[in-house]
């Protein structure tokens, strides 16, 4: 089994809410399918991710279509980003338009506030067992890369769903970037279970955050100790 392979069964259930706008699972799948029409399977791609519908749709598309995905946070050091791009030579990069201003002749396609840039046409020799690479925490120094296989991604997600008894009726809220393992895990488990994720950009100590907790009847949220400091 592959992660997200059963998203279609949830259809009109609410997958995501961002800035009071509702996205069903059908909406998420339709947005994800836009990328599969452009990017070939087994492509090597880099996602500079924000917690928003476009990054999540691109991530879901990457998993479903077998891209080998490197996920970076939107605050990733630019020097590290360019070095990573030079070393890995990805086929495509998907990034927020404000992240970098690249003036070159590469093919570019724009999706809302994002740019999909074609970098390298050559086919990559990729182990099909691999799925994604995440960076360790820390964006100003030289973070290390952590590789996750398709199998690990799926089994870990299913184990967490079963242990925490996450159900379709559950509603959670984002508190961490999806580029980090814990933030991504919260997204994976709730989407895989057919639950609802509130996309949030407010810090947990803000009034707006706790207003969302009340307004959306949030069941639970996950975070790390450093967030409270």
Where is each model-derived feature located?
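Conserved AMP-binding/adenylate-forming
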Residues: 21, 35-75, 175-177
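Conserved AMP-binding/adenylation subdomain of ANL enzymes
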Residues: 154-171, 181-220
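Adenylate-forming
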Residues: 98-99, 204, 217-229
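Flexible, low-complexity linker/hinge segments
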Residues: 82, 103-131
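Conserved AMP-binding/adenylate-forming core of the ANL superfamily
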Residues: 9-39, 81-82, 148-151
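Hydrophobic alpha-helical segments in the ANL/AMP-binding
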Residues: 4-5, 53-71, 82, 160-162, ...
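Conserved AMP-binding A3 loop
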Residues: 24-25, 131-158
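A short N-terminal helical cap/helix-turn-helix that marks the beginning
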Residues: 1-13, 128-131
């Amino acid at each position: 089994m592959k992660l997200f392979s059963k998203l279609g069964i949830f259809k009109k259930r609410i997958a995501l809410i961002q800035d009071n706008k509702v996205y069903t699972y059908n909406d998420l799948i339709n947005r994800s399918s836009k990328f599969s029409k452009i990017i070939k399977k087994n492509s090597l791609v880099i996602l500079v991710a924000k917690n928003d519908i476009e990054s999540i749709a691109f991530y879901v598309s990457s998993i479903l279509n077998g891209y080998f995905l490197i996920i970076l946070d939107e605050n990733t050091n630019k020097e590290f980003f360019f070095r990573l791009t030079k070393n890995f030579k990805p086929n495509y990069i998907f990034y927020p338009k404000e992240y970098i201003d690249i003036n070159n002749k590469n093919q570019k396609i724009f999706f809302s506030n994002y740019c999909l840039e074609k970098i390298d046409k050559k086919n990559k020799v990729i182990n099909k067992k691999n799925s994604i690479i995440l960076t360790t925490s820390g964006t100003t120094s030289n973070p290390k890369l952590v590789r996750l296989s398709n199998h690990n991604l799926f089994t870990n997600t299913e184990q967490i769903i079963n242990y925490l008894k996450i159900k379709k009726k559950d509603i959670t809220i984002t508190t961490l970037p999806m580029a980090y393992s814990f933030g991504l895990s919260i997204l994976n488990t709730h989407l895989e279970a057919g639950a609802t994720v509130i996309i949030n950009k407010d810090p947990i100590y803000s009034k707006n955050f706790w207003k969302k907790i009340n307004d959306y009847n949030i069941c639970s949220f996950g975070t790390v100790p450093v967030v409270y400091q």
